[in-house]
Amino acid sequence: MPSKKSGPQPHKRWVFTLNNPSEEEKNKIRELPISLFDYFVCGEEGLEEGRTPHLQGFANFAKKQTFNKVKWYFGARCHIEKAKGTDQQNKEYCSKEGHILIECGAPRNQGKRSDLSTAVSTLLETGSLVTVAEQFPVTYVRNFRGLAELLKVSGKMQQRDWKTAVHVIVGPPGCGKSQWARNFAEPSDTYWKPSRNKWWDGYHGEEVVVLDDFYGWLPWDDLLRLCDRYPLTVETKGGTVPFLARSILITSNQAPQEWYSSTAVPAVEALYRRITTLQFWKTAGEQSTEVPEGRFEAVDPPCALFPYKINY
């Protein structure tokens, strides 16, 4: 019989203590994304001579977190336990000496519905309607249009300012391309783009976007913009949403050079240079080592399978 896992189960509310924190450890805690938390406070204590300086923190996470994940957030040297008491009591305990390293969000009242003002504060802090929807679902449903308009006029709306990674997976039908895409990230972080359709209904800023069974069914210039690094909005029925994907997964039965006619697009290299990785399905007979079944293998173009440079 398999042994049961030991250690604390995933939990939303944790407390931690870190003795003799370095500036690097303090900065790591300061720089944690505020969207991680419903409420977070960390105080500095023991600053007087003769006492041990330490950090005393309390976190009410937006989602349940494992013991190891909490350790990763706050540092391997931290002593961590599940929190007891209310958020307000933990706030008072962590701030009792008056030296606050960081505080974000607002203490939650267990059993009481979050009010609109707290949802608005979270929206303006994070610039994310998704975060508000996750943390304040009732308030979000009742005030969606107002919150969306506030975000637009506030100038706080998140915009892409990074290069979106583009991973292309090529192989015959039934070899597992779609399953590979499903395993890439959590379902809640993944959006599957409907094919042959300009609408992005249901997209809420997910960090992974899948173009499944792709063979050129997006307009050329739209695909280039998706795979770039600049701010972009995509259309939904009745509005637009910012495109915030950090990874695009393209599965296809065809290699990229077959997606569009070279005579119909101005410069195919514009797409190829945006591709980060390219993988092809290989059967055992095609591989240099004996493998019982086929598998995906990354290639390093230019090569026989794809005679063009990528990722430059």
From Swiss-Prot:
Chain positions of motif RCR-3: 93-96
EC numbers for this chain: 2.7.7.-, 3.1.21.-, 3.6.1.-
Reaction equations catalysed: ATP + H2O = ADP + phosphate + H(+)
InterPro entries: CRESS_DNA_REP, Helicase_SF3_ssDNA/RNA_vir, P-loop_NTPase
Keyword DNA repair on entry: no
Homology family: Belongs to the nanoviruses/circoviruses replication-associated protein family.
Species of origin: Porcine circovirus 1
Protein name: Replication-associated protein
Subcellular location: Host nucleus
Cofactor(s) needed: Mg(2+); Mn(2+)
Organism phylogeny: Viruses, Monodnaviria, Shotokuvirae, Cressdnaviricota, Arfiviricetes
Effect seen on changing Q179R: In strain: Isolate IBRS-2
One Pfam family named in its UniProt record: RNA_helicase
